[in-house]
């Protein structure tokens, strides 16, 4: 249905242009002009289908066919314009008006097909896959609009609450506490309301947040902020500039006394001391920015400086899955998946003179814990992987897409293969076809090197041209009877 809508939109725009030109030129809208306009609309239908076919051919295999299609459309339109446009020299007024409608209508339809359709396709599909993300579908657009609509509504309610509390005769810190309590419960409600995600919270230590601490976490997505605010009932956060200046929630974080990292941690410590005295924890992302691939980057020393200056424990929280649901590459795209958080044991702040060693030690601990979550939840049971695998074959033909949907369901998302194939090493997939098993195994473990081999050149071209492809994934067109296969830890046949 998405391709149908993308093909119909240029025709609808062309129809509006034709009607507008008729009104501007004073051409009467009668039965003759209606029939002619419908005829032009039908020609535009063919042009849109040809343009879409060229776009899909390039998207599926990488072969550029759009220029050839545009050339054919140009000569077809030129023939129609010359044939019907010749009527402009007729002396009869009706024939003259028919010629004008034909001339302007065909030109409008061609221009719209040449411009609107490729721009729309690039915006929703090819530009997303070029940066390693999934293409938009109607379902994903609805899900994303639902999530952001829910989020914006919550922010508006919080701003209304702040406005309502403003004239009341009570201390500002009490008002802030009311807003903080509201945020804590609203973020919990938001995560529960996300129908395409499942929230898993692991608190093996029984942490209650009764005592303030410097809470540190790995950073993958803006969802991390919502998750931490839903976990910590009473906390302020050290944020980046984009959070501070956000037109949606910037006013809220400023009202609550959140702090800007650009101010410098030396200046933040005295300001945060008052909040800590009131029982607030301090949330810091030591990486300083979101990770694009989920890997935990080097920790900066600011959080550990604050812990030493304020006399607080370090409380690590390891997050998994947020970067899959809303990645740095595609922040305005909400996907299926798991939101997992694990609260780790507190550690006392160490020697104030050695922040660097503390940061390195905390980073190593976070990477170990993240790897444990990765090995537990980077499995076929995580709905993210099935969703991404199906989306990698979306818009590559209805037969191929539905074949993959059925095959993935029958194979139970390749759970058996993931269980018996080593999670580290080289895996050769003989007769890989379009590559669904190869891509699933590659997604489930970043330590696998996958080599897919198949005799069908078209299938290999399709497999190679996927947004899931990574440097560790290779597809080879070869005859299995004569192919030189690499040494591998597992062969799949």
Predicted regions located by residue number:
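Membrane-anchoring hydrophobic helices of lipid-metabolizing enzymes
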Residues: 133-212, 391-407, 414-415
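Class I SAM-dependent methyltransferase SAM/SAH-binding core
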Residues: 436-473, 477-481
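Transmembrane alpha-helices and their membrane-interface boundaries in multi-pass membrane transporters
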Residues: 51, 97-132
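Non-catalytic C-terminal accessory region of glycerolipid acyltransferases
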Residues: 142, 268-394
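Hydrophobic transmembrane alpha-helices and their membrane-interface caps
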Residues: 3-50
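Catalytic core of membrane glycerolipid acyltransferases/transacylases, capturing the structured
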Residues: 162-182, 209-264
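Pore- and gate-forming transmembrane helices of large, multi-pass membrane proteins
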Residues: 60-90
């Amino acid at each position: 249905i998405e391709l149908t809508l993308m093909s119909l939109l240029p025709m609808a725009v062309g129809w509006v242009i034709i009607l507008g030109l008729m009104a501007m030129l004073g051409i009467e809208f009668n039965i003759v002009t209606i029939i002619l306009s419908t005829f032009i609309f039908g020609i535009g239908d063919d042009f849109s289908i040809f343009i879409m076919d060229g776009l899909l051919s390039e998207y599926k295999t990488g072969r550029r066919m759009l220029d050839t299609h545009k050339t054919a459309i140009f000569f077809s339109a030129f023939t129609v314009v010359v044939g019907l446009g010749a009527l402009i020299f007729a002396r009869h007024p009706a024939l003259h008006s028919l010629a004008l409608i034909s001339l302007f209508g065909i030109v409008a339809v061609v221009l719209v097909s040449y411009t609107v359709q490729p721009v729309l396709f690039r915006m929703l599909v090819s530009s997303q896959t070029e940066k390693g993300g999934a293409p938009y579908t109607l379902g994903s657009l609805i899900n994303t609009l639902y999530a952001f609509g829910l989020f914006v509504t919550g922010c508006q309610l919080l701003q209304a609450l702040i406005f309502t509390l403003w004239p009341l005769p009570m201390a500002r810190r009490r008002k802030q506490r009311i807003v903080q309590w509201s945020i804590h419960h609203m973020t919990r409600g938001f995560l529960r309301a996300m129908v395409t995600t499942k929230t898993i919270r692991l608190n093996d230590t029984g942490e209650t947040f009764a005592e303030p601490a410097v809470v540190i976490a790995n950073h993958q997505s803006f969802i991390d902020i919502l998750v931490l605010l839903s976990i910590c009932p009473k906390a302020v956060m050290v944020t980046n500039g984009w959070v501070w200046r956000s037109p949606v929630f910037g006013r809220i974080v400023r009202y609550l006394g959140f702090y800007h990292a650009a101010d410098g941690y030396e200046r933040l410590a005295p300001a945060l001391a008052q909040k800590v005295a009131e029982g607030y924890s301090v949330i810091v992302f030591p990486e300083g920015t979101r990770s694009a691939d989920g890997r935990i980057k080097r920790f900066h020393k600011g959080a550990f400086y604050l812990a030493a200056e304020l006399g607080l424990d370090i409380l690590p929280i390891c997050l998994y899955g947020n970067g899959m649901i809303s990645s740095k590459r595609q922040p305005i795209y909400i996907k299926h998946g798991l939101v997992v958080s694990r609260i780790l044991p507190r550690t006392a702040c160490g020697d104030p003179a050695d922040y660097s060693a503390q940061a390195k030690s905390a980073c190593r601990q976070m990477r170990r814990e993240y790897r444990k979550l990765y090995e537990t939840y980077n499995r076929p049971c995580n709905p993210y992987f099935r969703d991404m695998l199906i989306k990698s074959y979306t818009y590559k033909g209805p037969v191929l897409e539905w074949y993959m949907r059925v095959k993935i369901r029958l194979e139970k998302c390749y759970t058996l293969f993931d269980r018996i194939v080593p999670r580290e090493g080289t895996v050769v997939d003989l007769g890989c076809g379009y590559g669904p098993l190869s891509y699933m195994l590659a997604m489930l473990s970043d330590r696998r090197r996958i080599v897919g081999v198949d005799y069908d050149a078209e299938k290999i071209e399709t497999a190679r041209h996927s947004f899931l492809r990574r440097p560790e994934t290779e597809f080879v067109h070869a005859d299995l009877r004569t192919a030189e296969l690499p040494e591998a830890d597992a062969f799949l046949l």
